[in-house]
UniProtKB/Swiss-Prot annotation:
It comes from Pseudoalteromonas atlantica (strain T6c / ATCC BAA-1087). Signal peptide: none annotated. Residues 4-88 form the YcgL domain. PROSITE patterns: YCGL. This is YcgL domain-containing protein Patl_2802.
């Protein structure tokens, strides 16, 4: 399996949202509607995608598959924790 390179961009509109594309400034396969929501992409880095590499919240195989299939991968922030809901669940009587 070949090592791929990808360019990583941060959204100017959405916090903790990143766009991975196969080459620097190659947004040719990214839908226009997504680019409008994403805002002006802010270049972060060029990165090799190695199968033995780990990325915080991105599964490497999913990243490779999406880049190959769709020409981009959109990383969204994790859902916010609802601390009140967790607290109430912990306080509720257990049967």
């Amino acid at each position: 399996m070949l090592n791929l390179l990808c360019a990583v961009y941060k959204s100017s509109k959405k916090a903790d949202t990143y766009l991975y594309v196969p080459g620097r400034d190659d947004f040719s396969r990214v839908p226009e509607s997504l680019m409008k929501m994403f805002g002006a992409p802010r270049f972060i880095m060029i990165m090799p995608i190695k199968k033995d590499r780990t990325l915080g919240q991105v599964d490497i195989q999913t990243l490779r598959d999406e880049l190959t299939k769709n020409g981009f991968y959109l990383q969204l922030p994790p859902p916010e924790e609802n601390l009140l809901k967790q607290h109430l669940a912990a306080q509720s009587p257990k049967d």
